[in-house]
Design a protein with these regions (language model features):
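Small/aliphatic-rich secondary-structure junction motif
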Residues: 13-86
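A conditional alpha-helix N-cap/helix-loop micro-motif detector
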Residues: 32, 130-131, 165
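Structural beta-alpha unit
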Residues: 1-12, 17, 96, 104-148
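Short glycine/proline- and acidic residue-enriched helix-loop micro-motifs
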Residues: 81-93, 119-123
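A structural signal for isolated positions on well-ordered beta-strands in alpha/beta enzyme cores
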Residues: 23, 50-52, 120, 148, ...
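Gly/Ser-rich helix-loop-strand patches that form or flank binding pockets
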Residues: 1-12, 136-185
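Redox- and metal-dependent alpha/beta enzyme cores, enriched for Fe-S-associated oxidoreductases
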Residues: 59, 66, 86-110
Length: 185
C-alpha cells in the first residue's frame, strides 16, 4: 500500500500522513531480529513515531484449559482455584522466557534514537482460539491504533503450527486490508 499526502479542502495545503504508529511483532527468531533491525534503521533518530512491540506467547496446553469438574461443589472450587494458579504460573514463566527478546528489541530501537517513551510492549493472550494469531495481530493493531504492522518473514515453529503451516506474513497479507504491512525477509 502506498500512502500519499492529501490536500485539505479549506487551505489547499498538504497534510502529512498520520501513519506514525507501528505494531512490531517480536519473538526469538532471527527473522524477528531482522525486522527489529530494519525498523531501527528506517526510523533512526526520527521523532513522532510510536511503536507497540508485541510478543506472542504459545497457547496454554490443553490440559491447562479445564480440569473436567467434580461432583462436590467444594472440590470443584478447589480444583478451579488450583487450575487458575497453574495457569498464572505458566503465563508468568512464558512471559519471563519472552522478556529477553522484548528487552533486546527495546534496547536496539532506543540505541537507534527512538525515545523510550515511544515504545510500549505487550504479550498476546495465551487463551486465544486455535489458528487466530493473524486475527489477534490485526486486533492488537486496531486496539493500539497502529496502521502499520511489521513482521519477520519467518516465525517460530510453534507459531507456524498455529497458522496451519501457512506463513504468518501470508495470512496477514490476505486478512490485513486497511493496514500497511512491512514484511521483513
Amino acid at each position: 500500500m502506498v500512502q500519499t499526502s492529501r490536500q485539505t479542502r479549506s487551505s489547499g495545503r498538504r497534510r502529512k500522513p498520520t501513519n506514525n504508529r507501528l505494531l512490531l511483532v517480536v519473538d526469538q527468531s532471527s527473522s524477528s531480529k531482522r525486522a527489529v533491525e530494519y525498523v531501527a534503521t528506517v526510523l533512526a533518530s526520527r521523532r513522532g513515531f510510536q511503536l507497540c512491540l508485541a510478543h506472542f506467547l504459545s497457547q496454554l496446553p490443553p490440559e491447562m484449559l479445564e480440569f473436567g469438574g467434580a461432583e462436590d461443589p467444594e472440590r470443584e472450587q478447589q480444583l478451579d482455584r488450583q487450575l487458575k494458579t497453574e495457569q498464572q504460573q505458566w503465563i508468568a514463566t512464558a512471559r519471563k522466557g519472552a522478556q529477553p527478546s522484548l528487552n533486546w528489541a527495546c534496547a536496539r530501537l532506543h540505541k537507534a534514537g527512538l525515545p523510550a517513551s515511544s515504545l510500549t510492549t505487550q504479550f498476546s493472550d495465551p487463551f486465544r482460539a486455535q489458528n487466530s494469531v493473524s486475527e489477534e495481530i490485526l486486533e492488537l493493531a486496531r486496539t493500539n491504533k497502529c496502521r502499520t504492522i511489521v513482521v519477520g518473514r519467518r516465525s517460530l515453529s510453534w507459531l507456524r503450527r498455529l497458522t496451519a503451516g501457512k506463513d504468518l506474513a501470508e495470512q496477514l497479507v490476505q486478512q490485513g486490508s486497511g493496514f500497511t504491512l512491512w514484511i521483513v525477509e
